């Protein structure tokens, strides 16, 4: 295995979104948001289940109308993952979905209404033991803050967040997390840094409206990576103008890259050159698709020649080093076998699945021994 990153997590309080612990050292939760019409119950349920299959810990659902609130009730009955209801403008919708076993309420201080309306939402959340996310966004700051600062700034986002944190404090409500999102990486990062120094509540990370699948993933990896490497963040969402399933995949890829949380296979692959002895790119692309169901954490290196292949294989769970007609297969740093280059994908898939089963069984035995 590669060296573990010495990231010290920021200390934060613990809340629960459904059965998912957030903060106080809990694994960083990866979430996404549906992009279906919430009133289309079947489509929304299908999308949530697709997100569950790729590992989503939490899913947010927009609830813009009372009709959507009624649909939310039906959706909640058909899925297992905790659901966050995303509420804007009408506080009464928050009160309605609270009746339907919602796991968390996301409210935007910039548009939810006056303090009395916020108090009503908080009182309801307290009575039903529902946590709240205060979701500050650079694109929807309160009018007085827009006038005061002229444009979104880290100080403006911080002031908006602290205004509503203080309000919840006055109401003796501490079951909440906070986000200060912006589409600009530096604005978002600095806003989170300032907020992390002011409060000890869990922080939900995100670069909002980051862009399409490629550009959005890059922006999110930079912004979230900076914050996570500093120990900031308890949950995250990668916001992409793409299939929400991709948000979960990219989120876990970011966490895997920082060695904060492992899920599934971490592929290490060379970009290829004329020295490659087999089709590295085709092999990696095929295996990523074929092995999406594997959740066992492992490093798999796929290197096309002997320049860097042996070195990467030494620190990988499984590693392939390109050779003439046959390539060397390493397991836990030890050379074990040779694989035919012409049948690399099928052979390597079989070996990876077998290794995953072996690791799963070893972990199961370890758990049983601890329980005894």
Swiss-Prot record:
Pathway: Isoprenoid biosynthesis; isopentenyl diphosphate biosynthesis via DXP pathway; isopentenyl diphosphate from 1-deoxy-D-xylulose 5-phosphate: step 5/6. NCBIfam families: ispG_gcpE (TIGR00612), PRK00366.1 (NF001540). The keyword Iron-sulfur applies. Binds 1 [4Fe-4S] cluster. It catalyses: (2E)-4-hydroxy-3-methylbut-2-enyl diphosphate + oxidized [flavodoxin] + H2O + 2 H(+) = 2-C-methyl-D-erythritol 2,4-cyclic diphosphate + reduced [flavodoxin]. Keywords: 4Fe-4S, Iron, Iron-sulfur, Isoprene biosynthesis, Metal-binding, Oxidoreductase. Its cofactor is [4Fe-4S] cluster. Belongs to the IspG family. GO terms for molecular function: 4 iron, 4 sulfur cluster binding; 4-hydroxy-3-methylbut-2-en-1-yl diphosphate synthase activity (ferredoxin); 4-hydroxy-3-methylbut-2-enyl-diphosphate synthase activity (flavodoxin); iron ion binding. InterPro entries: Dihydropteroate_synth-like_sf (IPR011005), IspG_bac (IPR016425), IspG_bac-typ (IPR004588), NO2/SO3_Rdtase_4Fe4S_sf (IPR045854). Converts 2C-methyl-D-erythritol 2,4-cyclodiphosphate (ME-2,4cPP) into 1-hydroxy-2-methyl-2-(E)-butenyl 4-diphosphate. It comes from Salmonella paratyphi B (strain ATCC BAA-1250 / SPB7). HAMAP family: IspG. It comes from the Bacteria. This is 4-hydroxy-3-methylbut-2-en-1-yl diphosphate synthase (flavodoxin). Its EC number is 1.17.7.3. The keyword Iron-sulfur applies.
